[in-house]
A protein has these predicted regions:
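Post-DEXD/H (motif II) to motif III coupling segment of the RecA-like Helicase ATP-binding lobe
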Residues: 363-372, 377-434
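Walker A/P-loop
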Residues: 244-265
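Conserved RecA-like helicase motor core of SF1/SF2 enzymes
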Residues: 70-73, 505-508, 525-572, 577-582
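Accessory nucleic-acid engagement/destabilization modules that flank
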Residues: 2-220
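Interdomain hinge/linker at the junction between the two RecA-like core domains of SF2 helicases
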Residues: 413-468
């Protein structure tokens, strides 16, 4: 009697079924990713084919079949020796063997402790081989004979590259892992790209098949989709359709940069097929803020890519966003981390993970090959992030043949020059259209600080007026720090105004409620007091703004929340910038940049902020930008060194560095301890997210006494006061890193 062997147990799936499904995924990728041969040669698909067939053979071990969770060995170690029976040269067999060996864990993880790769001490290995051989009849009479039919399924012909020898059991026992690892050490640089693609696409096929998906999705005709929605294409939208390379796009807010980006993507996508054309490249739409990503995901899904899975979302809290918006969050979030979706809206950090060796980075790098990267709001990043993006782009364009589109309404020329050095792009600016038709603001510099100004405001019809400003309801009051925003909110509230406060120190649940309230009931409020979160988070339109001083590019982002569609009817609204900020602003912005901004704006005080003048104004502000430029270039150089040292199949030592650089922390106010404890007890972990407040590593380390880690719940709690109205109150905390 032959015992059938399972590859998956919940639900049960036979080994040959899992392999068959993974091969179907491979077939889908092979028919789409036509460029793979440009990187790794013509026989790559054959190598991947046999890698998939053999990758889980070790699961036939009796102990694994009996109880995989309690089995004390690695099935991939037992799968690896079967490459001996492939009729390829040793180099190709070693590529397959290493990809199989590391498809779950990296080399140093397998080569330590109880999971030791059998180099010298082979007793444990030989014992597990005997377990495998107890099910050899399944392999020889049921599984391996299917290989010929799989060859015909994928390649339409017999390859006959796999042939068991008569003494195959002994050859398995005598497989030389030491020799394999020595070959790896000698060839890991020379064969780097082969190892990345072979392991990466094995993981892609394996993971998708395990998730119940048997093909990858490809994009529809984006030009057709966009043109169905737009009556006429604008000048730049026409031009990007003939831009078959990297590009930098500069256009004012309201121009339609999203549609322009989709048209650029259409122009640069590969075409596969004749009767039915598919567009196989992966497109990454990259934005700096999670709120912007959420809004873009909804827009693309509802307007252009409504089919299931065509567009997805990926950031540190996307799972919770999908959950609260009643999407099939587990499935969508799982697939978003795989190679399934053709268009991903995400933060740059999700792509950077690959270059820091985080997670299944070979799979991510495989789908980044020949990808199209759209960077919107590129001006919004700190110099260190900009430097890393530049380093990442240099490698993606040079080594992975990716293309990039950089977009911004407010990009300093020095920043544009840095990207031009990497991209060698086509520059796209309005030439025929008059940019001033997008003008919608009159600029007013006013004396004093925000506290004194709001104390003097008097209500007059639909306005709030003082000696130096006339604010039309609803008013956005933009503050540079959370503390100042709370102070302003309290004063306005005490004066009897209908006011709402929003900043980043609310729990995610409260922040979600506040954003929905602004979207649905903005006109019922006199004032909305906010920090920088309002610059990017909401697609709403205020009638006026009173803002603390900030760098010009940040101010323009804030103005973008005012009179958003006014340009269509020639409506102009006043924006008011105070000349004085607060003492704590130095932790947020460079004093010299803010000072220079005020000097530049003084020249056009009381005038229209014409779109045709914006670039010159920004360049004046940043005319002495050498320090910022040097910082960016320094980080770029360091990033390139780090990225080029990334070794495939090996766990990167830079993973911790990545999380320290970019990943903040979330804490739970102690007032929610009992609630969170109960949710954990009920297994409702996604609900716990409602009670998390984001903080920085800086504050955790510097003010550690206010935080405690619950080992059982694996959650950091804070003793700082929390109010649903005001957010997390810093008490004794320094303002420095509580800025948003």
């Amino acid at each position: 009697m032959i015992n059938l062997c399972l590859a998956k147990f919940s639900p049960s799936e036979l080994l040959e079924c899992h392999v068959h499904n993974a091969l179907n995924v491979m077939k889908s990728i092979m028919n789409s990713f036509i460029w793979i041969n440009e990187f790794v040669g013509k026989d790559f698909w054959e190598l991947l084919f046999y890698t998939i067939i053999l990758h889980d053979v070790g699961k036939c071990a009796k102990g694994f079949q009996k109880n995989p969770k309690k089995w004390d060995y690695r099935h991939e170690i037992l799968s690896t020796p079967f490459v001996k029976f492939l009729s390829y040269d040793e180099d190709k067999k070693n590529l397959i063997a290493l990809s199989i060996l590391t498809h779950h864990k990296y080399i140093e993880e397998l080569d330590s402790g109880m999971q030791v790769i059998p180099r010298i001490y082979k007793d444990a290995y030989l014992e597990k081989v005997e377990e495998l051989l107890e099910n050899k009849n399944y392999l020889t009479t049921f599984f391996f004979p299917k290989i010929n039919s799989w060859e015909r399924l994928i390649f339409k012909k017999d390859l006959k590259k796999f042939n068991l020898s008569d003494n195959w059991e002994e050859q398995i026992k005598n497989f030389d892992f030491k020799e394999l690892l020595e070959w790896y050490e000698e060839n890991k640089e020379k064969r780097k790209i082969h190892l990345i693609f072979l392991k990466g696409l094995l993981n892609a096929c394996d993971h998708l098949a395990s998730a119940g998906e048997h093909k990858i999705l490809t994009l529809p005709n984006l030009k057709k989709r966009v043109c169905e929605k737009l009556k006429n294409l604008r000048e730049l939208q026409e031009r990007v359709l003939e831009t078959y390379k990297n590009a930098i796009l500069e256009a004012p807010t309201g121009y339609g940069k999203t549609e322009t980006a989709l048209l650029w993507a259409h122009a640069n996508l590969d075409r596969v097929g004749e009767k039915k054309v598919i567009y196989p490249n992966r497109v990454f739409y990259i934005l700096p803020y999670k709120a912007s990503i959420n809004a873009m995901y909804e827009r693309l899904k509802k307007k252009y890519l409504s089919e299931d899975g065509m567009v997805t979302i990926l950031h540190s809290s996307s799972k919770y966003y999908l959950y609260v918006n009643e999407y099939e969050y587990k499935r969508i979030e799982s697939l978003s981390k795989k190679i399934y979706n053709p268009l991903k809206v995400l933060t740059p950090f999700q792509i950077m993970k690959s270059f820091f060796g985080v997670g299944f980075y070979e799979m991510e790098l495989s789908q980044l090959a020949k990808s199209l990267l759209i960077f919107d709001e590129i001006h919004a990043y700190e110099p260190n992030i900009t430097g890393i993006i530049l380093g990442m782009l240099e490698i993606l364009i040079k080594d992975y043949k990716a293309k990039a589109l950089i977009m911004s309404a407010t990009m300093p020329t020095f920043l544009k020059e840095l990207f031009k050095e990497v991209l060698n792009p086509q520059e796209l600016k309005m030439e025929k259209e008059n940019p001033d038709k997008f003008t919608r603001h009159r600029l007013n510099l006013i004396e004093g600080n925000i506290i004194d100004t709001i104390k003097d405001l008097k209500e007059y019809k639909n306005y709030y007026v003082s000696d130096n400003c006339r604010l039309e309801k609803p008013v956005l009051v933009a503050c540079n720090t959370v503390d100042r925003a709370i102070e302003v909110y309290k004063i306005l509230k005490k004066r009897g105004f209908n006011v709402l406060l929003i900043h980043s120190r609310f729990t995610y649940g409260d922040r979600e409620k506040l954003e929905k309230e602004i979207k649905n009931n903005l006109k019922s409020y006199d004032f909305v007091v906010a920090t920088q979160v309002i610059e990017v988070s909401l697609d709403v339109s205020f009638n006026s703004i009173l803002t603390e001083p900030a760098p010009l590019d940040a101010l323009i982002q804030r103005f973008g929340r005012v009179n958003r569609q006014g340009w269509k009817k020639g409506i102009i609204k006043d924006v008011y910038i105070l000349k004085e900020g607060s003492e704590k602003d130095k932790y947020v912005y460079k004093n010299e940049i803010v000072k220079k901004t005020l000097e530049v704006l003084k020249e056009i005080n009381g005038e229209l902020l014409k779109e045709s003048k914006v670039q010159k104004l920004i360049d004046k502000v940043y005319e002495n930008s050498k320090d910022i430029k040097d910082e960016i270039l320094k980080i770029k150089k360091e990033s390139l060194q780090l990225f080029n040292n990334l070794i495939p199949l090996y766990k990167s030592g830079d993973e911790e560095k990545f999380y320290k650089l970019f990943k903040g922390l979330e804490v739970v106010p102690e007032k929610y301890f009992d609630k969170v404890k109960q949710l954990a007890k009920e297994g409702k972990y996604i609900e716990i997210y409602r009670y998390l407040v984001p903080i920085s590593f800086y504050n955790l380390f510097k003010y550690g006494d206010s935080f405690s880690y619950d080992k059982k719940l694996k959650i950091i709690f804070t003793s700082l006061d929390y109010s649903e109205e005001l957010g997390l109150l810093k008490n004794n905390l320094n303002e420095g890193n509580w800025i948003l």
